[in-house]
């Protein structure tokens, strides 16, 4: 995945050193875009090993509408532990906004179900959008959404997705985000009778934390390897019926893991 290495190199060479909420410090740029053709392989970073199990379970958790980390803990996923309260709750984060956005009249809007219906009935619509950024509830969220809005686009039987990510932790977060939204695009394409197209990843504040700079430089010394292939169970036609066992990654041969600390 040369696109990801190019992003890291660009930030190292052209980024601005800035303070941040966590007190760690970052090197960042504003505005950057990557594009991945999903027909060319599943975009899972190969220059270090990524924990696909966490990516899949987190996505299924988002799609379920859940905002408590209990499901994640039961499946050995700890990526949200630092932000949960003593009961495991995170407030009205991604799952709530995706599946139960509160309307002023008291209704709750299931953005994902509406999206699927619109793709099937009006694939040329320019309104195939899901937003997790709800200004009225941001202060109640344990962590305001970093990947805040995504849009789908249908052309020639192919489904493409563009994500706008307001805040992008390049070393730890972005590899997860690329794989997660690529997988979501494949899942939505399957249940809508389409082929996966491109995943376009647009970043706002794209940053390397100051305690990730050496790890990034190490990763840049490694050559990308061929992308793996992601196989979905073709029998699944309901987006909300996917389970962990419906996914099979083939041909993933990454370089060794590179350890780095999460900035909380």
From Swiss-Prot:
Record-level Gene Ontology MF annotations: thymidylate synthase activity
Active site annotation, chain numbering: 146 (nucleophile)
Name the UniProt record assigns to this protein: Thymidylate synthase
Source species taxonomy: Bacteria, Pseudomonadati, Pseudomonadota, Betaproteobacteria, Neisseriales
Keyword flag Methyltransferase: yes
Function: Catalyzes the reductive methylation of 2'-deoxyuridine-5'-monophosphate (dUMP) to 2'-deoxythymidine-5'-monophosphate (dTMP) while utilizing 5,10-methylenetetrahydrofolate (mTHF) as the methyl donor and reductant in the reaction, yielding dihydrofolate (DHF) as a by-product. This enzymatic reaction provides an intracellular de novo source of dTMP, an essential precursor for DNA biosynthesis.
Catalytic activity: dUMP + (6R)-5,10-methylene-5,6,7,8-tetrahydrofolate = 7,8-dihydrofolate + dTMP
Family as reported in the entry's similarity comment: Belongs to the thymidylate synthase family. Bacterial-type ThyA subfamily.
Complex formation: Homodimer.
EC numbers: 2.1.1.45
Main enzyme class: transferase
Binding-site residues, (6R)-5,10-methylene-5,6,7,8-tetrahydrofolate: 51, 169, 263
Compartments reported by the entry: Cytoplasm
UniProt-annotated binding residues for dUMP: 21, 126-127, 166-169, 177, 207-209
Listed PROSITE patterns: THYMIDYLATE_SYNTHASE
InterPro entries recorded: Thymidate_synth/dCMP_Mease, Thymidate_synth/dCMP_Mease_dom, Thymidate_synth/dCMP_Mease_sf, Thymidylate_synthase, Thymidylate_synthase_AS
Entry superkingdom: Bacteria
Pathway given in the UniProt record: Pyrimidine metabolism; dTTP biosynthesis
């Amino acid at each position: 995945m040369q696109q990801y290495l190019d992003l890291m190199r660009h930030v190292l060479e052209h980024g601005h050193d800035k303070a941040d909420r966590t007190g760690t410090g970052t090197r960042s740029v504003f505005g950057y875009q990557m594009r991945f053709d999903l027909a060319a392989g599943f975009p899972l970073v190969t220059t270090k090993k990524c924990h696909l199990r966490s990516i899949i379970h987190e996505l299924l958790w988002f799609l379920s509408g859940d905002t408590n980390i209990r499901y994640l803990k039961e499946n050995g996923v700890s990526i949200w532990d630092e932000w949960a309260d003593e009961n495991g709750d995170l407030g009205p984060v991604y799952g709530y906004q995706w599946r139960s956005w509160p309307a002023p009249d008291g209704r709750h809007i299931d953005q994902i179900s509406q999206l699927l219906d619109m793709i099937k009935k009006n694939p040329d619509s320019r309104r195939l959008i899901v937003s997790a950024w709800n200004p009225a509830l941001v202060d109640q969220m344990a962590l305001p959404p970093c990947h805040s809005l995504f849009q789908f686009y249908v052309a020639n039987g192919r489904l493409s997705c563009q994500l706008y990510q307001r805040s992008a932790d390049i070393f730890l977060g972005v590899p997860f985000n690329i794989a997660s939204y690529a997988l979501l695009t494949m899942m939505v394409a399957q249940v809508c009778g389409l082929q996966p197209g491109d995943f376009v990843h647009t970043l706002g504040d794209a940053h390397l934390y100051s305690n990730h700079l050496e790890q990034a430089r190490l990763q840049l010394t490694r050559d990308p390897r061929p992308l793996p292939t992601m196989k979905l169970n073709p029998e699944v036609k309901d987006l909300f019926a996917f389970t962990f066992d419906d996914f099979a990654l083939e041909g993933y041969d990454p370089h060794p893991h590179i350890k780095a600390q999460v900035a909380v």
